[in-house]
Swiss-Prot record:
Residues 1-202 are annotated as: Disordered. The gene is AHI1-DT. Transmembrane segments: none annotated. This is Putative uncharacterized protein encoded by LINC00271. Residues 121-142 have a biased composition (Basic residues). It comes from the Eukaryota. Residues 10-23 have a biased composition (Basic and acidic residues). Residues 33-50, 59-73 have a biased composition (Low complexity). Residues 92-101 have a biased composition (Polar residues). Disulfide bonds: none annotated.
């Protein structure tokens, strides 16, 4: 239907597909479309007169390798063995890859028979899109992961994360536990030592040796799922260390003293 003999295709499309009308017609007679689509105006006037033989026959004079822009867009290759019609701007070095193709081996109902085997394979893999046009390289096929790189992930920087509308988070798809709720950054109490300006988690890991040891054991992965989702607040003697009471007891914040007392009692309990 699309390529029926009555259908006229413009010259650009005829160049794009590199169609060969000699496979379905005798070598002396031009195909039904070839006089319309592939010949220039001068060649049309030659072939339309009754006494002049058509220029596409076997006795046609050889065309130079670089055809001028006014000549017919289709050319024969230099060797007389293969008479394959090719676009004028196509690369002549690729003719070594072309094999003689049996008619109808790869011809679809909606596309003209291809000029060579590699174009046939390209056309079968994804559409007519990659068949080389004249003077232009084929479009590169898109990468497989392009769909996931379009938007940033939930964290804003992960390139491979799924879109947030997808329903499942990126970590759940890989079997990871869901991320914990972030700790609130705790403001230091008014009279406190500068060490407590760190967040509770950072203080716990740096200042306390025993608790840091427990943390390293826990974070190696054995007890990963047994940790509570939010860190527990250690029962200091100082009320100002509890986040709810921070603002209400600014005068009681002897935090370094209370921490020292707590660790002394903690170590005594262990021993």
């Amino acid at each position: 239907m699309l390529n029926s003999p009555g259908t006229r295709r413009p010259v650009k499309e005829a160049q794009k597909y590199g169609e060969d009308s000699q496979k379905s017609h005798s070598p002396g007679t031009p195909g039904p479309r070839s006089s319309v689509t592939t010949l220039s105006a001068s060649a049309l006037s030659d072939s339309s007169s009754p006494d002049t033989p058509p220029r596409r026959g076997p006795g046609r004079p050889s065309t130079p390798a670089r055809a001028p822009a006014t000549s017919a867009p289709m050319m024969y290759s230099r060797r007389g063995v293969r008479r394959t019609a090719r676009p004028a701007g196509a690369d002549t070095r690729s003719s070594a890859n072309q094999l003689p193709q049996p008619s109808g081996a790869c011809a679809n109902a909606d596309s003209a028979p291809p000029a060579d085997v590699s174009a046939c394979l390209r056309r079968r893999s994804h559409g007519d899109r990659c068949v080389p046009r004249s003077r232009r390289r084929p479009r590169p096929r898109p990468r497989a992961s392009t769909a996931f790189f379009q938007e940033e992930g939930p964290c804003g920087a992960c390139p491979g994360a799924l879109r947030p509308q997808a329903g499942a988070s990126f970590r759940e798809l890989r079997g990871l536990p869901p991320p914990r709720p972030r700790e609130r950054e705790q403001s230091p109490p008014l009279g406190a030592a500068p060490s407590s300006a760190l967040s509770h988690q950072g203080w716990k890991n740096t200042r306390c040796a025993t608790r840091g040891l427990v943390n390293t054991l826990v974070n190696t992965g054995h007890f990963l799922y047994l940790q509570p989702p939010a860190p527990l607040i250690m029962p200091y003697l100082d009320d100002a260390e509890v986040p709810g009471n921070r603002r209400s007891h600014p005068s009681l914040s002897f935090s370094w003293l209370s921490k020292a007392l707590y660790h002394v009692t903690f170590l005594l309990r262990i021993l």
